[in-house]
Amino acid sequence: EFRKIRSQNQNFINLCLNSKLSSKITLQPIERFDLDSAIIFSDILMIPYALGQNVNFVKNGGPKLDEFNLDLFLNNDERKFTRILDPIYEAIKITRNKLKKNKSLISFVGAPWTLLIYMLGIKKNKEEIDLVKLNKFDSQINQIIQQLIKYICVHIKNQINAGADVVQVFDSWAGLIPKTKIKD
């Protein structure tokens, strides 16, 4: 079922921003297996996308983000961010209304460091990051992290207000944080 929808919607970001299809995909496992919870169909990289960084998903290659632009990133506002992600919140509302009351609706976000690693394009592989690239942003890391925290919180709040029962924070690349940065 999902593969059919996906094959008809090549742009993954646009699929995530299609409220009706996102809800339909979310509900497929519930309808088929009567699970206890549904997980909203979305992606952790919707935050960088809403903050102005182009995100593409390359077949058999994973996500590819355009080069990070600090000025663009820092010059965002909550209204624009929320407006871009409104279709996700609408998908949550639609799904919540279609779910039985005894079923939980789970949504999610990426944690600051995980998003930062994707946004700066510094992941070499599953076990290391490009420290040379990271060091290019050394003086701005705290500022970038604080901005990410702000928008992650906005996204969490909006998802809860839309009807999510639980919001999972994925910190997929926390183990790649250099020890020198953990204190910061």
Region spans (language model):
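N-terminal basic, low-complexity leaders that serve as flexible interaction/assembly modules and, when applicable
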Residues: 1-50
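Short aromatic-enriched loop/helix-cap "lid" or pocket-rim segments at secondary-structure transitions
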Residues: 2, 51-53, 118-120
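Short glycine/proline- and acidic residue-enriched helix-loop micro-motifs
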Residues: 9-11, 71-80, 134-141
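A short acidic, glycine/proline-enriched capping/turn motif at secondary-structure boundaries
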Residues: 44-47, 62, 112-114
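Pocket-flanking alpha-helical
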Residues: 49-52, 95
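A charged helix-plus-loop insertion that forms the helical arch/lid used to bind
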Residues: 55-70, 125-131
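A gly/proline- and charged-residue-enriched helix-loop-helix capping module
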Residues: 60-98
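Active-site loop segments of alpha/beta catalytic cores
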Residues: 84-184
